[in-house]
Regions:
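A membrane-topology feature that recognizes alpha-helical transmembrane segments
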Residues: 1-168
Length: 168
């Protein structure tokens, strides 16, 4: 049941993210609530506690990227929903494999689209901005203002979740 639910969630998220570049709140919130309910049904209040902890760990790991305007809110809510199903340890493993998959996908996309040199210049500018001003959003470099290729980050999130299911 758990594997099937996560596969359904990430499949739907990828479908929406690839088509519309958005992940619906109904999907992310509904998936999180279903994860809380499933954990409670399986293990009572301790299950609910682990589910809430999984949601919190996942959101805490990805929220900074949203606050720095490098990731959409739907992506954060999606990893939170996955964390609600997998608990805190599963959320950590999923976050790791999501980061790996996201890095590989980003590299493939920038190389395929001839954007590598500009992306390295942008990365340098962001790092210098953070060095001078601290970890704050770079006003001219947000998801909304970017001219570069965009990633449907539900895809690496799905990859991270599926690898987590596979190795556990």
């Amino acid at each position: 049941m758990l594997d099937a639910a996560i596969i359904a969630i990430v499949t739907a998220a990828c479908f929406f993210d690839l088509r519309t570049r958005r992940i619906p709140n109904a999907l992310t919130f509904g998936a999180a609530l279903a994860g809380f309910a499933f954990a409670t049904a399986m293990n009572g209040l301790s299950g609910l506690g682990m589910s809430l902890a999984g949601w919190a760990v996942a959101v805490a790991l990805f929220l900074p990227f949203f606050l720095l305007r490098g990731m959409g809110a739907g992506d954060v809510k999606l990893v939170g929903a996955i964390g609600a199903w997998l608990g805190p340890a599963g959320a950590l493993v999923t976050a790791f494999f999501t980061a790996v998959a996201g890095g590989v996908l980003a590299l493939v996309v920038v190389l395929a689209r001839g954007y590598f040199a500009e992306s390295m210049r942008n990365l340098w500018a962001i790092l210098m901005h953070w060095r001078v001003f601290g970890l704050r959003p770079v006003p001219d470099m947000t998801l909304q203002s970017s001219r570069g290729p965009r990633l449907a980050y539900a895809v690496p999130i799905a990859a991270g979740a599926l690898v987590t299911l596979w190795i556990r």
